[in-house]
């Protein structure tokens, strides 16, 4: 074989290999069972993203998120709402407590409700309050569980003000 054919086949093989790798990565991303990007909330589920909170910079980011929650509550005249998650064990207790305290200072009562899909008492509290903020952890929260919560809220006319995305 001459040198030109080796270069030609090498380039074509390299390009096809790279394209195949990209396709495989895209398919893995598209068919992932966990939430991996902010657009999963906004585009796929049609929910407003209230903000991203990382545990390392929690205080600065929490102020921004609380301001957005307050604006939504004021707009809809809400004084009591629930904090819901597909798995509240993934959300740090410090973050939950700080959200409750900051909103309480602004005369908004935030009740942390765990497992609303399976716990009937938490479910009835959610229905009584009529409004909720969802908090999920990117890379951990499962699509199906989040969809189940959203469906439950929509069916029972519970307004979801938005979602808070958390990460390490």
Tell me the role of every PLM-derived stretch.
Residues 22-54:
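Flexible, low-complexity linker/tail segments at the boundary of structured domains
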Residues 1-14, 18, 44, 58-168:
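P-loop NTP-binding module
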């Amino acid at each position: 074989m001459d040198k030109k054919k080796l270069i030609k086949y090498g380039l074509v093989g390299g390009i096809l290999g790279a394209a195949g790798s990209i396709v495989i990565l895209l398919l893995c991303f598209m068919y992932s069972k966990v939430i991996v990007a902010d657009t999963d909330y906004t585009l796929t589920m049609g929910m407003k993203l209230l903000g991203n909170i990382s545990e390392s910079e929690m205080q600065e980011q929490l102020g921004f998120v609380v301001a957005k929650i307050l604006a939504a509550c004021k707009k809809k005249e809400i004084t009591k709402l629930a904090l819901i998650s597909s798995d509240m064990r993934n959300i740090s207790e410090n973050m939950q407590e700080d959200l409750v305290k900051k909103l309480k200072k602004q005369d908004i009562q935030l009740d942390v409700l765990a497992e609303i899909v399976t716990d009937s008492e938490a479910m009835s509290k959610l229905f009584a309050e009529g409004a909720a903020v969802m908090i999920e952890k990117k890379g951990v929260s499962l699509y199906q569980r989040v969809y189940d919560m959203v469906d439950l809220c929509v069916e029972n006319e519970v307004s979801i003000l938005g979602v808070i995305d958390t990460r390490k």
